[in-house]
Amino acid sequence: MEINLDKLNPDIRKLSGMKEVLFDKNLVNSDQDFDLYYMYRGVEEKDGLRYDITVVPAKMLGKEFVKTKGHYHLENWQEVYTVLEGEAIYLMQKRAENGEINDAYFVKANKGESIIIPPLYGHVTINPSKTEQLKMANWVSPNCKVDYKPYEENQGACYYYLDSGWQKNENYANIPELRQEMALKFVPQNLDFLK
C-alpha cells in the first residue's frame, strides 16, 4: 500500500519528549531540542484496524542510535510492523508481575519484512543506520492504549543500542540475556488476531 505522506500532518516526537529514555546524560541535561521521528497515525482504516506510518531519520543521539520512545500495550493487544524503507531493530521486553524483566529479544528487519509484537511485551524500534531513514508501517486496533511510564521510570528499555553494540540498562534490577529472533518474510494475510 503506497501512501503519499506529503499532505499529511504527523505527530512529531522531539528530543524533549525522549529525555527520560536516553542513554546519553549530556543530551538529557542539555537545552537542545530537535525532531527525532514522525508518526502518521490512522492514514488508513480497514476491517476495524488502524494503519500508521512512522518515519525515523538516521541520527545518533550521542553514542546511541535513534529510537522510538518505547511503550507497553495495556491489556493483551498485539501489533504488526512492516519495514517499508531502510532497516529496523525491534527490541521487545516482557515484565513479570513484580515489574522485573523476564524476557528480552530483538528482531532485525529489512524492507518488506514484518514482526508481530506479542501480548504483554513492551517494544522500542531502533534505526541502526547512520545514513538511511527508517520508514515502517503498523496495523493495530484503534482500541489499543499504550503505557510509556515503565520506560520513563527506568530511563529506557532494558538494553540500549550504541555504536559499540548492545549495553544493559543498569536501572533495571535483573536483565535477562538478549536473544535474536527472525523477522517474518511477509505480512500475515489474516490480521483478525489484532482485534
PLM-predicted stretches and their roles:
Residues 2-108, 127-195:
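Active-site region of the double-stranded beta-helix
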Residues 108-129:
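Conserved metal-binding segment of the jelly-roll/cupin
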